[in-house]
């Protein structure tokens, strides 16, 4: 289905590209890459869900390689994108309540962008900085 494959919603390449471009845009607006977290930051459910998913990436890549199953990387990156978009729609990154929270969310956004880029690279797909 041509329309589904070009959709910015759900399981599609453009959806992943859009999520990556969104992350890069947020990081560009931050105008800094030197984020420091000095105090403990209280994490939301959405942030914890993202951290748990990020933690699984090396295992997913290893399993995908051992089983010759690139679909495992596809499933991972779609799940990651959905979790990030849910987080983004629930919490402000650049307008967080505290500087520590803002810095944590920027670091989280940077990690998500890197994992989307790494996942797509493993699948032979280049990322787009803007859409």
Residue ranges and their predicted role:
Residues 1-131:
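Non-catalytic interaction-recognition regions
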